[in-house]
Each structure stands twice: as C-alpha cells, then as structure tokens.
UniProtKB/Swiss-Prot annotation:
Annotated source species: Lachancea thermotolerans (strain ATCC 56472 / CBS 6340 / NRRL Y-8284)
Tree of life domain: Eukaryota
Higher taxonomy: Eukaryota, Fungi, Dikarya, Ascomycota, Saccharomycotina
Localization terms from the record: Mitochondrion
Protein name in the entry: Altered inheritance of mitochondria protein 23, mitochondrial
Gene of this entry: AIM23
Presequence positions on this chain: 1-18
Length: 378
C-alpha cells in the first residue's frame, strides 16, 4: 500500500467514473491549506488517478449517517429478536394454565370391578348389578345381610363384593329403599346359576324395550301378551288365496300335517299374496278389518271358499274341529289343535278308518254341491 497525497482544485469537473472511484476511498485525515482541501487516501495502486473534489464535512456527514443507520438497524433487529423470544417463551407457571382442561374422565368414579373368579358371563352379570346400584345412588351404598350377625347393614357395594367368588355366588337386587332423591338397594348373595338367569332376563328385557322404542311391535319381536297364546307349541303357516290346488294338496298339506303330528297347535293365516309378503303380515291379519274393502267377483269368492273347505278336509284326520275367524272376502284365520294320540294300536286303526270315512263323506258332499251349481248355471 502506498500513501498518496493529491491536491484537488475546488473547481474541477468530475465524471461518473471518478465519482464511483471516490466511494472506494478510506479517509484517514484531512485539513485546510490556502483554500484548498488536502485528502489522504490509502489505495493499492501504482499511479495517481484523478479523483473528484469532496468536502471533508460531506464525507464526515455521510459517514455519520451510515453509522447511525447501521446502529439503528442493528438495534431494531435486536429488539425484534427479543420480542420473538418473549412470544415463544412461556414461564412454567403459565404452562400449567395453558394445559388442556380436564375432560372429567380422571374424576369418574369406578362402577365396576376387575374380577379374578368366575366366567366372563358371570363377571358381566356381576358388573351389570354394580352399574344398577350406582344408577340408584352415586356412592354405591347398599344394604346387605351381615353373615356374622344376620342383621342388615349399610356398606359400599365395591367393598362388600370385592371378595366375592363368582364361581359359587352372584349378586341380585331384591328390594329398593327410597330416601329422598336417591335409593338404597337391598343386595343379597344368590347362586351363580340364579344370577346368570336374572342377567339374561334383564338383557332380554332391555332388548325388547329398545325394539319397542324403535317402533317394532310385540308380534314382530316374539313377545307374548295377554291376547296371545300362553303355550309355546304354536306354529304359524301362511296360505295365499292365490295358491294352486297342486301346492295346496301336496306341499302345504304336508307342512300342516307334519306340525300337527308333532303335537303343535297350528294357526293358518289366509290372505292375499301381496299382504302375506309384507314384513308386518301378522299385524295385518290380526288388526281390525277396514271399513271399505275391495269387492271380489263371485268366481274369486268361490275359489276362496274352496280353499277353506279343502283345508278342513286335509286337517280333519289330525286336528280337532277347527276354529275359523274372519271372512273370505278379506282375510281369515283357521286355528287347529292336534288330536290326542290313541294309546292302543286297535284304537289307532279304528280312528284312522273313521277319519277316512268322514273324509270320503265330505268329499262326496262337496262333489254334489259342485254338480248342483253347474246345473243351475245351465
């Protein structure tokens, strides 16, 4: 590096290149002498180059402006960084306040036990009873019989049932005492089989109530009411008014007779084909007949009467006198009860011959009626 001193005339023309070169100078010192400005510069060059005239005051002012601007920018940058750090930093005390609020599961009381004895079904039955208790009162308070003193005492169901052996015993609520707004159930130990049976009945009852709430009737759920038959040996068979003679005398006759032979009661539901194919066909059969019904031709009514008479002939040998409800104009129910079985072989043979004769006589009467109708038409 060479130290070069250049004396510049204050009245001097400079081009753009000289002005650009001036910006590369590093000013170390300057002073006034006879109205002229002396500028010392450090420049890595071998010869003197023309430099534009610059006042010392302007250079110093520019340097101050650049220095102040740089300092201000650095200060603003540090302040922005500090604010960012403050935003992202959360004190431990505030972290506790910003945690997700509790959903209540941590404070939910236990309403079941983890059993070590008994089958899964027995454990489910016991926990079902526990949930019933907690529905009556939140604390799970029950009345039980003290095995030592044989006296009633109040305790917690979880404590009392904790040591229960489900292979031998189960829980059952036998009574409920009302106290203000809550109830205290009386719980007793029962045999494991009894507890399982009670549990199954409760589940069936809940399922039935759910189906009823969804709009399903007792007929569709299989529930028996006061108007239904109290016996379980009842079979329901549908017979369409449009059935052919071949199907009636073969497939349908075999289906009816086989059930009567087994000792079942049989209800024959006769209605139109479309009505019997509905999902609620049993309700349509038992509901009251509508006031306005479609009229059928005489030929259609004769066909329906023929089906009823033919069914009576088919079941005569195996059924007692059938009970008929309804009308051939709309729908009809034929209720059949099986005949008692003869105890001796001779009685069975005689009964069979008698039924055969009765069937033959009915068939002859039917043919006579048919001939009579044909003669009247001619």
């Amino acid at each position: 590096m060479k130290l070069i001193a250049s004396v510049l005339n204050p009245v001097h023309n400079f081009d753009a290149r000289s002005t650009a070169m001036l910006s590369l100078l590093t000013f170390k010192n300057c002073f006034l002498s006879n109205g002229r400005v002396l500028i010392f510069q450090l420049k890595p060059c071998r010869k003197l180059q023309t430099t534009r005239f610059v006042l010392a005051e302007s250079v110093a002012s520019n340097n101050d402006i650049l220095f102040n601007a740089t300092a201000s920018m650095r200060k603003n940058k540090d302040a922005a960084k500090l604010m960012t750090d403050r935003i992202h930093y959360v004190s431990p005390a505030k972290r506790k306040q910003t945690r997700t609020p509790s959903t209540g599961h941590q404070n939910r009381k236990r309403t079941t036990l983890k059993w070590n004895t008994g089958s899964e079904r027995a454990q489910a039955a016991a926990n079902f009873t526990l949930r019933q208790v907690f529905k009556m009162n939140e604390r799970g308070v029950v009345k039980v019989v003290n095995q030592t003193t044989n006296k009633l005492e109040e305790t917690s169901i979880l404590i009392w049932a904790g040591e229960l052996d489900l292979q031998k015993h189960g829980l059952a609520i036998v009574d409920v005492e009302q106290r203000g707004t809550f109830s205290i159930p009386l719980v007793k130990l029962v045999e494991s089989k009894t507890a399982l049976k009670k549990y199954s009945d409760e589940l069936a009852k809940q399922k039935e109530e759910e189906l009823t709430r969804l709009g399903f009737s007792s007929k569709r759920t299989g529930r028996k009411n006061e108007n239904d038959s109290n016996e379980d040996n009842l079979k329901q068979i549908k017979v369409s008014w449009q059935i052919s003679d071949a199907d009636l005398n073969k497939q349908k006759a075999n289906e009816i007779i086989s059930q009567l032979k087994k000792g079942y009661k049989v209800f024959l539901y006769m209605n139109g084909k479309d009505a019997l194919n509905k999902s609620n066909w049993a309700e349509d059969i038992t509901d009251e007949e509508p006031a306005h019904t479609r009229k059928h031709s005489d030929r259609e009514l004769e066909r329906r009467q023929h089906i009823v008479e033919q069914l009576q002939v088919i079941v005569n040998e195996f059924s007692l006198s059938p009970t008929v409800e309804g009308s051939i104009e709309t729908r009809l129910i034929m209720k059949l009860s099986p005949k008692p079985v003869a105890s001796k072989k001779e009685d069975r043979m005689a009964l069979k011959e008698q039924r055969k004769r009765e069937r033959q006589e009915k068939l002859e009467r039917k043919l006579e009626k048919k001939k009579l109708r044909n003669s009247e038409n001619y």
